[in-house]
Amino acid sequence: MVVAVEASLYLDVFFVVLMLAIAGELHALNDAVAAIRSPAGGPGHAVPARAATGTVDATSAAPSAYKAMVGVVSRHQLILASIRELELVMNHSIFLLLFLNMLNICVHTFVTAVLLQKEVQPTTMYKMVSTLPIYMYETGLYCIFGQTIIDQGERLATSAFSSGWPECGVRFRRVLLVFMLRASQPLQLTVGQMYTLSRHTFLQLLNGSYTLFNMLYQIQGNK
């Protein structure tokens, strides 16, 4: 029993750390794309002489901004790949965990309600009451950090628009447009191909537990 509890704890820590790492990368990516500016002072600045003679492309007047945007796109692709890999690993195990936690919340709430109607020892009641928050905390942990990834992903398009794109060249704007189109698609972790780790899912699980509890309580009352 102790080994199973420790294994579950280590698994939770492992997945939470990975989710935090992805959320942190998205936060850093938001800051990076919003900070991109043209070092040359805008598209109307003087073009170097070599550009006029044809030795340098005129659109490369601010190459650092373009290169920075290409780096942002590459970094974004790595984050997308990481989310897909993490989703693949969490798909079945976390779905089963959330489902069992929903059942455990229902059962513990039902047993606590029944015990309150009877004369039981305080230690028994304490065990039931103290166990219930553990399942709620574990479920909320995954959903809250999953929501963090969603929130950071939704910021990407706004951060891109907040960059210094008006003062950058055409190549930069094209890459930025492609990035914004891709960033408009939601970044989220889905388990069991039906549950997205988010605040809404957490509320759904609690609502499911309450529905089951209400059904069991009505059956118990009819006896």
Which ranges hold each PLM region?
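Membrane-embedded alpha-helical segments and the immediately adjacent membrane-proximal loops
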Residues: M1-K223
